[in-house]
């Protein structure tokens, strides 16, 4: 009788490395380790040998970068999705795609169980399990970190050392880092005290603004219907645009974020993020929207942006609400076409210029020179009617 198979989302980090041996011993099952490439820079070529040496029966590496950019990141960018107005949702965006890839491999490998390495008080457990339940309701879900005997990362490190499991985390390097092409999240260690500034060794890719070049970088981005298509006059695919902006932005200290955020599970947490490309692209996209969107659409879309961010953050990507909001967002993005020129300097993104064939800015109406075509006399009647309701109210209640 063949053993049952468990497909696990494997990153090669502390939790999932320990998890392979723990699950194998507890369930006497074959472990199918699955790693998705979302553009993380850390070493990935040794993951297969590491997973197999740790006890996995097989290893699958799935390149998800293009799908991640085109079907996830660009949707979030067009929606203007920043969780609580700050977080560009790098980790949160990657989870439903990783979960989907894990389900695909699990089905192909005839697995009966799905496992993730998320903590019992984090957001990712929700994102993975809601996606699993949506796409593979027949499979059993395992969450070892909610039930195993290890009560701290130090205990996991000790277990790994005892069983010769190679891990990069040590008691001297306690940070938990999650990375993809859209950003990096950094937790644990001294970062758990919100009054302590993040040490420089916590940051993975960005240069400190104080040490950034004294000469700014200037970049020009072209958008078509809300999607970046070119950089500095050169047509490029989305993946390459993000890679280049991450490199340039990181060198100039762009995209360092430090926030207290409200988790799905009801607690507040202190999060450190690095997101150079996301910071630059959201800034540029928003400025192009200011130029091209009609006032009521621009202002109403802010509500949709937060709703969309909540959907991503809360793990309900595969929902009818998200697909319905996509339809609204796509309609708003039809005129969001044009060029945006930016300056990157010591941690700051500054707007230098923008233009669009669908610009609603009319210089002849806005100017205060002799070229002015605005009908000033019309303002008197407009103001009278505009303020009539308040005038009437105050006459009655203050009379």
UniProtKB/Swiss-Prot annotation:
Pathway annotation: Amino-acid biosynthesis; L-arginine biosynthesis; L-arginine from L-ornithine and carbamoyl phosphate: step 2/3
GO biological process, one term: L-arginine biosynthetic process
A family per Pfam: Arginosuc_syn_C
Entry-linked InterPro entries: Arginosuc_syn_C, Arginosuc_syn_N, Arginosuc_synth, Arginosuc_synth_CS, Arginosuc_synth_type_1_subfam, AS_cat/multimer_dom_body, Rossmann-like_a/b/a_fold
Binding site for ATP: 9-17, 117
Binding site for L-citrulline: 87, 123, 127, 176, 185, 261, 273
EC number: 6.3.4.5
MF (Gene Ontology): argininosuccinate synthase activity; ATP binding
Keywords (A to Z) from UniProt: Amino-acid biosynthesis, Arginine biosynthesis, ATP-binding, Cytoplasm, Ligase, Nucleotide-binding
Endpoints of the signal sequence: none
Locations listed in the record: Cytoplasm
Amino-acid biosynthesis among keywords: yes
Catalytic reactions on record: L-citrulline + L-aspartate + ATP = 2-(N(omega)-L-arginino)succinate + AMP + diphosphate + H(+)
Family affiliation: Belongs to the argininosuccinate synthase family. Type 1 subfamily.
Protein name: Argininosuccinate synthase
Organism, as annotated: Chlorobium chlorochromatii (strain CaD3)
Lineage, highest ranks first: Bacteria, Pseudomonadati, Chlorobiota, Chlorobiia, Chlorobiales
């Amino acid at each position: 009788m063949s053993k049952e198979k468990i497909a696990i989302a494997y990153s090669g980090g502390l939790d999932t490395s320990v998890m392979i041996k723990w699950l194998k011993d507890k369930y006497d099952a074959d472990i199918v380790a699955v790693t998705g490439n979302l553009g993380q820079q850390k070493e990935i070529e040794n993951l297969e040998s590491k997973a197999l040496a740790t006890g996995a029966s097989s290893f699958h590496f799935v390149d998800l970068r293009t799908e991640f950019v085109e079907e996830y990141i660009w949707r979030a960018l067009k929606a203007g999705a920043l969780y609580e107005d700050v977080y560009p949702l790098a980790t949160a965006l990657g989870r439903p795609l990783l979960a989907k890839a894990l389900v695909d491999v699990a089905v192909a490998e005839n697995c009966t169980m799905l496992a993730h390495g998320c903590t019992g008080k984090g957001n990712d457990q929700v994102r993975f399990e809601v996606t699993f339940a949506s796409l593979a309701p027949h499979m059993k879900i395992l969450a070892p970190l909610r039930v195993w005997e290890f009560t701290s990362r130090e205990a996991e490190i000790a277990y790994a050392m005892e069983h010769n499991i190679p891990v990069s985390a040590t008691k001297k390097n306690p940070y938990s880092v999650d990375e993809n092409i859209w950003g990096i999240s950094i937790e644990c260690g001294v970062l758990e005290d919100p009054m302590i500034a993040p040490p420089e060794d916590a940051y993975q890719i960005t240069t400190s603004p104080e040490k950034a070049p004294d000469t700014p970088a200037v970049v020009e981005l072209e958008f078509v219907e809300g999607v970046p298509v070119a950089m500095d006059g050169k047509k490029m695919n989305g993946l390459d645009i993000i890679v280049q902006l991450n490199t340039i932005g990181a060198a100039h200290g762009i995209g360092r974020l430090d926030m207290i955020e409200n988790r799905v599970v009801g607690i507040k947490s202190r999060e450190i993020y690095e997101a150079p490309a996301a910071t630059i692209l959201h800034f540029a996209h928003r400025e192009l929207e200011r130029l091209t969107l009609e006032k009521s659409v621009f202002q109403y879309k802010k509500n949709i942006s937060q709703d969309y961010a909540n959907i991503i953050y809360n793990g309900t990507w595969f929902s009818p609400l998200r697909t319905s909001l996509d339809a609204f967002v796509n309609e708003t993005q039809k005129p969001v076409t044009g060029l945006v020129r930016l300056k990157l300097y010591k941690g700051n993104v500054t707007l230098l210029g923008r233009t669009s064939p669908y610009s609603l800015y009319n210089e002849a109406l806005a100017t205060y020179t002799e070229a002015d075509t605005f009908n000033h006399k019309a303002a008197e009647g407009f103001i009278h009617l505009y303020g009539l309701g308040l005038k009437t109210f105050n006459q009655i209640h203050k009379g």
